[in-house]
Swiss-Prot record:
Protein name (database record): Cell division protein FtsQ
Topology relative to the membrane: Single-pass type II membrane protein
Phylogenetic classification of the source organism: Bacteria, Pseudomonadati, Pseudomonadota, Alphaproteobacteria, Rickettsiales
A Pfam family of this chain: FtsQ_DivIB_C
The encoding gene: ftsQ
Main location: membrane
């Protein structure tokens, strides 16, 4: 009985030692893997975010571009959509790449940011259409008025953004004058567009005190609009025009600031 007991104890001790050894080996393996991962992360960070290995990085990048170019991944076509007022040479200049250039070498975010510096461009999307095409989608600002301020003229959009000083291609746009006129021009133009005949007779809109509008009509007629809810006043003036009772009555001023009582001054 004593011999069997001694033999069992030896077997248990051997098993315990084997388990302990496996655990140690397992821990060593995990530590080794963790160490390799940390080393790899450090290497990647140094490679990407620092100047270390700069020569290797440049060499690898150059070889990748050369290889992919040989496989047909090179710039052959540029598709531009949404272009109206921005000329094509300006866009291609920002692209800064010749035909046959490695298509993967193009920095799309940089191209997009540089295009957005053009005041005509409100938004732009740039993408690669592999293997050989760059696609550019422009969303241009739409001029809605010519703003006169401090003896200068600007094209402005519905948000009041100054687009350009070149107003010559847009002689049909409404002239708005005064401080803040650019900001509120969008609302005024939107309302006037409901009455095309009246809008065609409006030569300018003057913003007064940054509060309200005076419309200068052809024939030297001045329309004083109220500060708020001027839609009814516009509707009234349009009705006069349609009834042929506006431009043949020697009107000088139509004061519509008080919606309960309109005042008319004649020449």
């Amino acid at each position: 009985m004593r011999k069997k007991t001694s033999s069992n104890k030896k077997k248990q001790t051997k098993k315990t030692n084997n388990i302990s050894l496996r655990r140690k080996l397992g821990l060593m393996y995990k530590k080794a893997i963790l160490g390799l991962k940390i080393a790899l992360i450090i290497f990647v960070c140094l490679f990407v975010f620092t100047k270390y290995f700069a020569g290797i990085k440049t060499y690898l990048t150059t070889n990748i571009y050369q290889t992919t170019t040989k496989l047909g991944f090179k710039l052959e076509n540029v598709i531009i959509e949404g272009q109206q007022n921005v000329d094509e040479p300006t866009i291609l200049k920002v692209l800064n790449a010749n035909k046959g250039s490695p298509i993967f070498a193009l920095k799309l975010d940089e191209i997009r940011n540089n295009l957005k510096k053009n005041k005509w461009i409100k938004e732009v999307y740039v993408s690669r259409r592999l293997p050989n095409t760059v696609y550019i989608k422009l969303f241009e600002r739409e001029p809605i008025a010519i703003w006169q301020i401090n003896n200068q003229l600007f094209l402005v959009d519905e948000e009041g953004y100054e687009i350009s000083k070149n107003i010559q291609p847009f002689p049909h746009l409404l002239h708005v004058v005064g401080e803040g006129a650019n900001i509120y021009a969008g609302t005024l133009v939107l309302e006037l567009q409901k009455y095309p005949a009246l809008m065609n007779k409006t030569s300018a809109a003057v913003r007064l005190g940054d509060r309200r509008w005076d419309l200068n009509l052809k024939g030297n007629i001045s329309i004083k609009l109220p500060e708020k809810e001027f839609e009814e006043a516009l509707k009234y003036v349009d009705a006069l025009n349609k009834a042929n009772k506006l431009f043949n009555q020697n009107y000088k001023v139509l004061d519509l600031r008080d919606k309960n009582k309109y005042y008319i001054e004649k020449y």
